């Protein structure tokens, strides 16, 4: 970790030069979030300096936001908001890297469909209206198509309850801005999609993580939090959860919905992965339609470049959501709406999703074969998998070791709500590999590391 550490040759005090040297390794990605730095005495002994100097250097690093001290756990590399692993949406262009850290569909079916669709758009009767302003909720014809698409899942086909957004993340931002005030408490799984953490920080909301098990959020923990914290809302990813891949059973959904109903807590349902799911389970919007804001979109199931999302909300709050969107962008691009509406209306969206599911099944089969000996949590049509690491690996150290060998994965710390490390695991995105061969190669490297059964020796020697 701090092998062969050399202090800069300048006139600054030794503690500042030590802080600079460690900070440089963090900036280069040699030290990643969650890794524990060696004890002060060990560093002092290896560099021939006194312990007080090391302590002052660590304090300087804390002031820079690069490390954090945790009682009983020592000093850890901090997870920075700007760090690549904390909220990443684009694959790395690093040469030779098979980047499985980004969640993306596994095929180019959307690109092929778009090439066929674009020449036809100018003949669409709605094309003439593309240069006009549209209501903040979105063009009426697009809302009708979206309501039909979501019928049976949310909204019962009622276009009047649909707001169209520039993707699900934009929808989530509008919902939080519309329905929560600075300082309000939002509940979520203790490990969950990073986007909710980023939004709560930016909007001054107090995000609290609740205990989970292999079936998702625990109803008893939700009940206790509602009784003591008086939360404004609970955020849930009920289908193919990101990152754990858990799909809440109907019983678990009903139990959580009952708690929300007893305490009048709004349910924010992020259901972007539902189209990939190969079974039917009632949504929270179906179980508690007047207490649930349902968010979905096409980016995860069709293509990330198709920034098109849906918010289905109770009529009592729909106007607030639309007003929040209007402040953002007035309304979504009608051109994007026309592209997406055509895909929904002519069945192309369904065909693309079928292709994605089949490709994911092939990739899941490779995963089961190569990592058969390890504790992998996943689902037949999930675009990602959650690898529980054996002793003595920790998420950040394993992600670093993988990257050094040409494979990108995301450690559990990137998904943690709060500052505690709650799982020693990494997320592996199966759809991100350019080909089945690349996926097999990357998984083989991961298996080789796991079979090695040991961490690199860390320390300043």
Regions found by a protein language model. Give the residues of each.
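Conserved glycine-rich beta-strand-loop-beta hairpin in the small C-terminal domain of fold type I
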Residues: 357-368, 376-389
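N-terminal basic, amphipathic alpha-helical segments
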Residues: 1-122, 126, 131, 142-144, ...
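Conserved core of the PLP fold type I
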Residues: 129-263, 274-293, 451-460
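Amphipathic alpha-helix from the class-I
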Residues: 316-320, 338-355
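Active-site PLP attachment segment
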Residues: 72, 288-320, 332-335
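Hydrophobic residues in well-ordered beta-strands that form the structural core
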Residues: 188, 209, 267-269, 340, ...
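Short hydrophobic/aromatic beta-strand micro-patches
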Residues: 312, 386-388, 429-431
